[in-house]
């Protein structure tokens, strides 16, 4: 079966610095896949290379079998991929509902607001609150909701639980798990190992810009030497 998202031989640079070396990965429809690794290993660069924020100098990226490598990020977004940046990137001067409506303006298809609010009841309660008045967890929920309202085939999450209280992390893990159970495909980068392994069915370990290991999430739990070697845990 053809993968929903497939990358082969990605090589990406920042200036003259070679960051990714022949990175290949596959994500099937309705799958949750995680990229693990130390800080600076190349995980976020992998997401940005898939999304077109960073243009790979070599390699292939296919979304449902259609080549998208080299396209601008807005074109890749229209094709069905959304990236939620670590910085969240919401409009602080707009309220929650305005943020959502603005995100859906240029979408080829979009979710109705009530569907979004059904997944994120906190956002419905705060729908008239400005982005700057939201907590960090609420801002992250809004960032994810802004991506989902565009009805993406796959959503890329860059450090979605970073800096959030444990209670909010558990709530976001539950929400992401429900999205996955309903068929949403997710590729995430995250340092919170417990949260990641609670969500992902499969993981890639990125080390110094290379794919060092790929396998089921349960295997990572059962092989502490992998955690020690590549994550320092």
Regions found by a protein language model. Give the residues of each.
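Glycine-rich phosphate-binding loops of nucleotide-dependent enzymes
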Residues: 2-233
């Amino acid at each position: 079966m053809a993968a929903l998202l497939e990358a082969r031989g990605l090589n990406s640079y920042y200036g003259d610095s070679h960051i990714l070396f022949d990175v290949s990965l596959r994500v099937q429809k309705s799958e949750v896949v995680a990229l693990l690794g130390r800080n600076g290993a190349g995980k976020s660069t992998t997401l940005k290379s898939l999304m077109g924020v960073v243009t790979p100098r070599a390699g292939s990226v296919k979304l449902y079998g259609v080549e998208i490598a080299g396209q601008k990020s807005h074109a890749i977004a229209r094709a069905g991929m959304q990236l939620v940046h670590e910085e969240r990137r919401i409009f602080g001067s707009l309220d929650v509902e305005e943020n959502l409506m603005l995100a859906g303006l240029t979408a080829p298809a979009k979710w109705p607001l009530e569907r979004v609010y059904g997944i994120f009841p906190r956002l419905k309660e705060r729908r008239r609150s400005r982005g700057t008045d939201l907590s960090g967890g609420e801002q992250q929920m809004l960032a994810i909701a802004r991506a989902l309202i565009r009805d993406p085939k796959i959503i890329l999450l860059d450090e979605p639980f970073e800096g959030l209280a444990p209670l909010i992390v558990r709530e976001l893990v539950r929400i992401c798990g429900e999205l996955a159970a309903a068929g949403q495909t997710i590729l995430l980068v995250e340092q919170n190992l417990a949260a990641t392994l609670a969500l992902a069915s499969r993981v890639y370990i990125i080390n110094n810009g290379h794919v060092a290991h790929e396998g089921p999430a349960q295997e990572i739990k059962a092989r502490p030497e992998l955690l020690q070697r590549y994550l320092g845990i």
